A protein has these predicted regions:
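Long amphipathic alpha-helical scaffold regions
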Residues: 1-334, 502, 512-545, 549, ...
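Extended, charge-rich low-complexity regions and/or helical-solenoid scaffolds
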Residues: 338-624
Length: 625
């Protein structure tokens, strides 16, 4: 008996083709005939067969079966009726067996879902289904079936609607479609449904700029935002990760469709803050990843990242991240600034930027030093150092404000960070000083005086903090850099003061013998390039340099440092010092030290040792004489 119905469907198909009767009448009879099969699986396959053999015989526009009596509405009505009955059979399948095989039945239902979905595909292919028919007839009747309270059916049908019908129809019927979302069962994966809808709409908007006014006309953003809020309110048990995923999709839609509307972007972030307000710090790793995706989206979209970062709700979202994730997000922000070669050009922008990366420039929790991974910490601080190098403004006064702002923040970061963050600050300030050469006095009406003397004073105080960390070798190098910059600015007292501080640091803090050798050669090399000092100051400094050279731990080191001091008394510049007598004294002194070193080697090793030092001294004699 069951096979006869398949035969009747085939006969009906041939009868329509013969055109001896109206197509709508035959289709109506076939649909009614299928009602006699109420077994869910048998009924589904029978109606699926009916849909398959009749799809090319529908009275569509341009079809050979269209006529005065056969219209597009007849075709639509037939497909919708068949779809409705198939969906009812499909939903009923879940009640066809005992509870113990419920899982098996759900699996079977999932495998048979495409039989139902084919009807919607057929509807989307009917040429005569324009926007009006879709809005007034098709969508309401399909949504009636979505309201069946069955989780699997609701998810699948909503997904089918979004996938098979044109983007233009979705845009123009957005309010109707979104109105069904809060009515879905709490277990329905609504975030995936809405995400796919927003993806389709954003791709549609990207396909042609001419379409964008339509999005504004239908207020797509407002409707999507409202729908998401209603869904989150209706599904009180929705996990945080689900809610945040919805906001990520909405933000992606906003950035693609309304990239110029920063207020929309901030509104999405604000809605996310509201949802997170009951969770001071996120502990769900999946939710945390979604938050990172949410915060990363504006960075990827806008070329002027600093402007994007001024969104008022951006830092409020970051406040809900744990310390580890906050650092990850801070690194992403810095990496984007580096990648886009963005210049942070004002102190106000810098303050906002530092507020966002505060996880890298200070401790956010009570984590002990022992818990920090040394390599990770170095990488983080190097990121901050690179950011400091990106701070620039052509206006000297504004650049000075930037430097003062940087100093304030990095000094609050604790001693461990200073060796990484102070050097870029110093070099950035020295660039400004070279730009300000020749200026003196305060800038009228400014809280931040942009003059070389004042900035040198600031650097002296900053390096002093670094030397107390302790990081004496780094501090000494920076003192010498500042001394050289003061020399270029013709500021003798300032340069002398930096050298004095370098010598004090060398004597009191540099204890390692290898570090002492490196330090004294740096001092000698820097002092040799100085041309700002008068006779008295230069004599004082050169005397200290030669004295410390002769006091190094190892004789070979003493010898090399002393003959290096000879360059302090003979400078090849036109106006440079040329004191041959003192050059000779240095070389003779180094020769005595070399002799002592060889005698010591003879005593300890029983041999005179290599003559390397004598060859090096000979080279110096040849150079000078």
């Amino acid at each position: 008996m069951h096979y006869i119905r398949y035969l009747l469907c085939t006969v009906g198909s041939v009868y329509i083709k013969s055109k001896e009767a109206l197509a709508k009448d035959i289709l109506k009879d076939l649909v009614e005939m299928c009602r006699s099969v109420q077994h869910p699986i048998r009924g589904l396959f029978l109606r699926s067969y009916l849909a398959q053999i009749s799809r090319d015989k529908l009275p569509d526009i341009g079809s050979e079966y269209e006529g005065e009596a056969d219209t597009v509405m007849d075709a639509v009505d037939f497909v919708l009726q068949n779809f409705t009955e198939m969906n009812k059979l499909w939903v009923r399948m879940q009640h066809q067996g005992p509870a113990r095989i419920e899982e098996k039945l759900e699996k079977e239902r999932s495998e048979l879902r495409d039989l139902v979905g084919k009807n919607l595909h057929v509807l989307s292919q009917i040429e005569g289904v324009d926007l009006e028919i879709y809005k007034e007839t098709v969508l309401p009747r399909v949504l009636e079936q979505v309201n069946c309270k069955d989780e699997l059916a609701q998810y699948y049908l909503m997904d089918c609607i979004i996938q098979v019908f044109p983007d233009e129809y979705h845009l123009q019927t957005l309010e109707i479609l979104l109105g069904a979302c809060p009515q879905l069962q709490p277990t329905v994966d609504i975030k995936t449904v809405l995400s796919r809808l927003m993806d389709r709409l954003s791709n549609y908007a990207a396909s042609s700029p001419e379409i964008l006014p339509d999005f504004l006309q239908v207020e797509a953003f407002a409707k999507l935002s409202s729908a998401i809020s209603k869904v989150i309110e209706a599904q009180v048990d929705m996990p945080i990760v689900g809610a945040v995923s919805l906001y990520v999709s909405l933000l992606t839609f906003t950035l693609r469709v309304h990239p110029d509307r920063l207020d929309y972007v901030d509104q999405v972030l604000g809605a996310c803050v509201k949802k997170l307000s009951g969770n001071p710090k996120l502990e769900d790793s999946k939710a945390t990843k979604q938050i990172v995706a949410l915060l990363s989206a504006p960075l990827e979209k806008y070329s002027d990242i600093v402007t994007a970062l001024t969104l008022s709700n951006y830092p409020r979202v970051m406040d809900h991240l744990d310390a580890g994730t906050n650092k990850i997000m801070a690194k992403i922000i810095i990496e984007n600034i580096m990648k886009r070669d963005t210049c942070v050009s004002t102190a106000d922008k810098l303050r906002f930027c530092f507020e966002l990366i505060k996880g890298l420039i200070k401790d956010l929790d009570e984590s002990t030093t022992d818990e920090l991974d040394e390599e990770d910490f170095k990488e983080e601080q190097n990121s901050v150092a690179r950011l400091i190098h990106m701070l620039y403004n052509d206006d000297s006064e504004e650049k000075a404000k930037i430097i003062y702002t940087v100093r304030k923040h990095i000094l609050a970061g604790g001693p461990m960070r200073l060796p990484f963050t102070v050097p870029p600050l110093v070099f950035s300030a020295l660039k400004l000083i070279r730009r300000l050469q020749g200026q003196d006095g305060d800038v009228a009406g400014e809280k931040v005086p942009a003059t070389p003397k004042n900035i040198f004073q600031l650097l002296s105080q900053t390096i002093e903090v670094l030397s107390a960390v302790p990081s004496p070798e780094m501090a000494l190098r920076l003192y010498l850099q500042c001394a050289e910059a003061a020399n270029d600015c013709d500021l003798e007292p300032v340069s002398y003061d930096f050298f004095t501080q370098a010598f004090v640091l060398y004597e009191e803090e540099v204890a390692d013998s290898k570090a002492q050798v490196t330090a004294i050669h740096l001092i000698i090399g820097t002092l040799q390039r100085m041309n700002v000092f008068g006779v008295e100051n230069r004599d004082t400094l050169t005397h200290k340099a030669t004295g410390y050279s002769a006091k190094l731990l190892k004789k070979p080191d003493q010898c090399r440092a002393v003959y290096a001091c000879s360059h302090l008394f003979w400078v090849d510049d036109q106006d440079g010092i040329k004191d041959g007598e003192r050059v000779l004294l240095c070389l003779k002194r180094s020769l005595r030290i070399a002799n002592a070193a060889q005698q010591m080697a003879n005593v300890t090793r029983g041999s005179s040792g290599p003559v390397t030092l004598f060859v090096e001294i000979l080279n110096k004699y040849l150079y000078f004489f």
